[in-house]
Every structure is written in structure tokens, then in C-alpha cells.
Amino acid sequence: MSRIGVAFDQARAEGRAVLVGCMPAGFPTVEGSIAAMTAMVEAGVDVIEVEIPYSDPVMDGPVIQRASDVALAGGVRVADTLRIVEAVAATGAPVVTMTYWNPVEQYGVDAFARDLAAAGGTGLITPDLIPDEAQEWLAASDAYGLDRTFLVSPSSTDARLHMTVEQCRGFVYATTIMGVTGARAQASAAAPVLVSRVRAVTDLPVGVGLGIGTGEQASTASSFADGVIVGSALIRRLLDAPNLPAGLTALRELSAELAAGVRTPAP
């Protein structure tokens, strides 16, 4: 079982969901992103999702786009992301990478899988790659023992959902709000329905994302999902801060609030 699987099992034994915190690699700098992700772990985030910044992020909302633009302007590369993965994995928290597919193709699919595994990464979330076009990635992830997480949404047909989760390993990512990422005032009412649909066809844990930004929302999501995935709300704490130390303080505060939320599932 992967480290992600262990984290989900431990959380399930505690009667709660796993908290997954997301941050772009190299934002605000390479060292700054390592400090940010480490702070998140220290404040109670269970799993870190490191996003490889990309110039055409079709699914990312304005907050993640702004942070990714900062990272790209700073010259961050895939090699920097792997160094960040290695540093954050040293905290003991499982680290999964999220990337659009083009950077992996440019790097080389087999080489990327090899180097991600060597850095201590547990697997990859691929928002714009579907299983029926992922033969090379399926082979590479098998070869290097990496989890692979594909996305399902409320619009997924039953046939598409079944085919997608069949190729997942580690957990399934349920995008519970249609559209781009970003914290919402209210979590999607479609989320519990989508989680139930996924659970009907797989025993894999289900993580919900897109729209969660408060401890209350995390508590609600923890009552029906196995994982609560938060990105934009955490990133905004760094974007809105006057400097990195202030940003890290704000990041710790929100991470602790979210961690408390998943540990007290709503009835």
C-alpha cells in the first residue's frame, strides 16, 4: 500500500477525512514553497499536493493562476518541482503531484515517473488526461509503483465514471463543482451524490475538491468524503500577505482551521 493509502486508512480509523493541501511549486519561490508546504504539514495537513505551474491551466481559477504566474516568472522548472517534492516528503507527509500533461510529455513520461518516485512522490493527479489516452502513463506508473489519480465530475456518465475509477490507484479525485477552481461561499450540493456514485463502483477512497475554503466546509465534506482537497483558499493566504513570514502565519492559521474541520465531521 502507498503512503497515500496509509494516510486514508489512518484517517478512516479516526473517523474523519484526510486533509489534502495544494500549493504550486516555486510559489512564491522554490524555498518559499518548501517553507509553505512544511508549515501546512506542521499545522495538520495530512497530504501535500504539489502543482507543477503551467502556462495554460484550463482548470485553474484566478488564485492558482496568479500563483503559478509568479512561479513561472521566477523560472521554476519540473526539476525544481521534484526537488520540492523531495524536501516536503522528508517531513513524513505523503506528497502527490498535480500537473497538466504537457510538462510530463516534454520531460519524458518514463523519466518523469522514475524521477518522481526517486524524489519520494507517491503519485500523480492528471486533470487533463483521461484513462483511454493514458497508456504510456499507465505503464510508467506501474513500472515505478506510483499512484495515478484521474478526475470525475457530476457530468461524468456512469460508463465514463466506471472506466475512470477502474484505472485510478491511491484515490479518486471528485471535482464537485463544474468550472475552474476556487473557494466558494457554499460547497456544492452535488458533492455527496457524486461521492456515492463513485463508491458504488470502487473501494478506493474519494477526495472532493473545488470550492472548499473554510473549516466549516471541511467539516461538512468530511462527513461524506474520504478526503478534503483545498488549494485556492490556502494559496490566497500567501498572495494577500505583505511578506512571506506573514503569509506563513496566515497559512498555518487556515491549515489548522481546516485540520480541525476534517477532525469534527458535520452530523
Swiss-Prot record:
InterPro entries: Aldolase_TIM (IPR013785), RibuloseP-bd_barrel (IPR011060), Trp_synthase_suA (IPR002028). Signal peptide: none annotated. It catalyses: (1S,2R)-1-C-(indol-3-yl)glycerol 3-phosphate + L-serine = D-glyceraldehyde 3-phosphate + L-tryptophan + H2O. Keywords: Amino-acid biosynthesis, Aromatic amino acid biosynthesis, Lyase, Tryptophan biosynthesis. It comes from the Bacteria. Its EC number is 4.2.1.20. It is an enzyme of class 4 (lyase). Pathway: Amino-acid biosynthesis; L-tryptophan biosynthesis; L-tryptophan from chorismate: step 5/5. GO terms for cellular component: cytosol. The alpha subunit is responsible for the aldol cleavage of indoleglycerol phosphate to indole and glyceraldehyde 3-phosphate. PANTHER family: TRYPTOPHAN SYNTHASE ALPHA CHAIN, CHLOROPLASTIC, TRYPTOPHAN SYNTHASE, ALPHA CHAIN. This is Tryptophan synthase alpha chain. It comes from Salinispora tropica (strain ATCC BAA-916 / DSM 44818 / JCM 13857 / NBRC 105044 / CNB-440). The lineage of its organism: Bacteria, Bacillati, Actinomycetota, Actinomycetes, Micromonosporales.
